[in-house]
Amino acid sequence: ATDIRQVVDSTVEPLMQQQDIAGLSVAVIQNGKAQYFNYGVANKDSKQPITENTLFEIGSVSKTFTATLAGYALANGKLKLSDPASQYLPALRGDKFDHISLLNLGTYTAGGLPLQFPEESDNTGKMISYYQHWKPAFAPGTQRLYSNPSIGLFGHLAAQSLGQPFEKLMEQTVLPKLGLKHTFISVPETQMSLYAQGYDKAGKPVRVSPGALDAEAYGIKTSTSDLIHYVEVNMHPAKLEKPLQQAIAATHTGYYTVDGMTQGLGWEMYPYPIKVDALVEGNSTQMAMEPHKVNWLTPPQAAPLDTLVNKTGSTGGFGAYVAYVPSKGLGVVILANKNYPNAERVKAAHAILSAMDQ
């Protein structure tokens, strides 16, 4: 067997130097067995070393948790993906959201909701008014434009359908049912000593700042040990209770394709094996920033056996990447306290997965 430590070391050490990353943690899983590789520090001042229990902001990887919560509502018969968005929020009734489905919101196809809320609307008080005044650029279901306000609203409405606030449902129901004990939206006082300091492009300390639907779109903080457990239950959900098995199946369903990528709920999927360039391309800035015509899969299709499932996530001071291949039982998680380019995360993960799949 390949010496995984050697592969991870030789991949991560030059990467951290080139990208000036203070701290980074890698978790891999193979045949149900997790291994951890930790590098550098969680905080440049205190020099606290990174461990597999260090908490990182995972940015948009949070979208996969939001999708799982929505899948849980779906499994419990509280919503249908075909329902109009306005059904769950009276303030949006009688207008465009009567013609935009929950699935459109969950897959970034509502009609051009932007990547971020505009600054003046980026708070809970202004949020509803933002959606009421938003003018679609495209017909619903025609174009994919990756968007926090889109999947954020999806999560918010899913929580409405379950009759509880999103944060409460996530922290008290969904995360415990997934077996995640060190995954938080709000990091409790008792865990703050584990919360890494993030560093921006200039190396200045930074933490995620509050915004509209932040919990739903980019609010999770977790460790590589919890995240690799999450990967394992995504690959082998049979140990979970039935509604969560169904929830995970919904997130791994392909709803449409854009070029080589199949869009799930939260997760993005590719045929495996995949060349590194194709995976880099699917996680490119262009893919995140520009609209792309979608080809709907009717009916939606369960992921084929050999599929790589992945998601990137970033905040001002953190960079995350998760990738796994359920048919092989292989997964990798890479968390860092710096927002460095997605291409570098993907290349590192691809090298590690390829070495494990020898």
From Swiss-Prot:
Name of the top EC class for this enzyme: hydrolase
EC number: 3.5.2.6
Disulfide bonding pattern of the chain: none
Subcellular location: Periplasm
An MF annotation (GO) of this entry: beta-lactamase activity
PROSITE patterns (alphabetical): BETA_LACTAMASE_C (PS00336)
Gene Ontology CC entries for this record: outer membrane-bounded periplasmic space
Active site annotation, chain numbering: S60, Y146
Binding residue positions for substrate: K311, T312, G313
Swiss-Prot/TrEMBL GO biological process terms: antibiotic catabolic process; response to antibiotic
Remarks, miscellaneous: The class C beta-lactamase family has a specific amino-acid numbering system known as SANC, for structural alignment-based numbering of class C beta-lactamases, or else the simpler name structural position. A multiple sequence alignment was used to derive a consensus sequence and then the consensus was numbered taking into account insertions and deletions. This allows use of identical numbers, e.g. for active site residues, despite differences in protein length.
Protein function: This protein is a serine beta-lactamase with a substrate specificity for cephalosporins.
Protein name, entry field: Beta-lactamase
InterPro entries reported for this sequence: Bact_CellWall_Synth/Modif, Beta-lactam-related, Beta-lactam/transpept-like, Beta-lactam_class-C_AS
Organism (species): Pseudomonas fluorescens
Keywords: Antibiotic resistance, Hydrolase, Periplasm
Reaction it catalyzes: a beta-lactam + H2O = a substituted beta-amino acid
Family stated for the protein in its record: Belongs to the class-C beta-lactamase family.
Main location (coarse class): periplasm
Top-level taxon: Bacteria
